[in-house]
Every structure is written in C-alpha cells, then in structure tokens.
C-alpha cells in the first residue's frame, strides 16, 4: 500500500485565501516527506476560450512561490477532477497508490470533485481540513461535511502528524 500527499491547484491564479493555508501545506509536505509518502502537485490549466485564469504557460498557472516543491511529480489537469489527468492516473497505477492525503483549493470545486471521485473509485481519502480553502470561505465547513458524507476522513494536520 502506497500513500501520497496531493496538493491541488495552489497556483498564482487561485484565491488569495491560499495565503492562509500555504504554511500548513508546507508543513504537510514536510510530514509526508518524512513519512516516506509520494508528494504530488496538481495544476489546473484552463483551456476554455474566453477565460483569463489558469491559462497554460502563464504566470497565473504557475505554482505559488511560497509553496515548498520537493518533487518533480507535477501533473496538469484541464477538468476539476485530478484523476482525469492521464499522467496522474498512470502515476497512481505504477506506484500502487491507494491512500490519498488531500489539501489545496478550491474546496467547492477541484478538491470536491477529486475527493468524490477518489472515494467513488474505492481509494482511501484523507482531507487535511486546515489545509483546504475556497474563494468563498463560508463554504469550507459545508464542504468538509460533504467530504465526510462521501466517505473521506477529515482531520486537521496535527491529528495526522501526532
């Protein structure tokens, strides 16, 4: 059984609220590294015509400079569900990963879709609740309850690192 920390969409075009969780995400990265987990970074590329954010090859699509990038496991998706990235799906299969620790943004979109689809696929999913944010902070608690209702374990980072 292999485990992975999945950091979702902590890019320059994401909500400014990422600044509230990036230190926690970096601590989660340190913990995952010390625990021998794989660490992956998911980036969203928006290929829809007429949109301005998350455009491929722009500063907005880059990972934020405050994020501690400790591996070359950076996968790009064009849909909200990270499992739709063929390269990420292949990485999961090749490394026999079946347990996921998830953090990042947006709680109401890409994190939600990814967690839902991971549990639907039968994976064990742990959401690091104090390392998840949203454009709409009022929705975060509702989303954490949703993740639990779909079979995810939801805990703060300190509970995982204890």
Question: Which ranges hold each PLM region?
Answer:
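Glycine/Thr-rich phosphate-binding loops of Rossmann-like dinucleotide-binding domains
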Residues: 16, 49-50
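Short acidic, Gly/Ser-rich segments with clustered Asp/Glu that frequently serve as metal-coordination loops
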Residues: 11-17
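Von Willebrand factor
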Residues: 32-48
């Amino acid at each position: 059984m292999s485990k992975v920390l999945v950091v979702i969409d902590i890019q320059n075009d994401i909500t400014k609220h990422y600044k509230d969780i990036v230190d926690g995400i970096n601590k989660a990265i340190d913990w995952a590294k010390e625990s021998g987990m794989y660490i992956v970074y998911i980036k969203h590329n928006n290929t829809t015509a007429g949109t301005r954010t998350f455009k491929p090859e722009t500063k907005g699509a880059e990972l934020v400079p405050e994020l501690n990038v400790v591996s070359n496991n950076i996968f790009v998706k064009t849909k909200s569900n990270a499992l739709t990235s063929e390269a990420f799906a292949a990485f999961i299969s090749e490394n026999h990963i079946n347990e996921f620790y998830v953090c990042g943004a947006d709680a109401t979109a890409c994190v939600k879709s990814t967690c839902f689809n991971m549990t639907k696929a039968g994976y064990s999913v742990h959401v690091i609740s104090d390392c998840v944010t949203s454009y709409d902070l009022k929705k975060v608690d509702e989303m954490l309850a949703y993740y639990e209702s779909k079979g995810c374990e939801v805990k703060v980072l300190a509970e995982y690192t204890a």
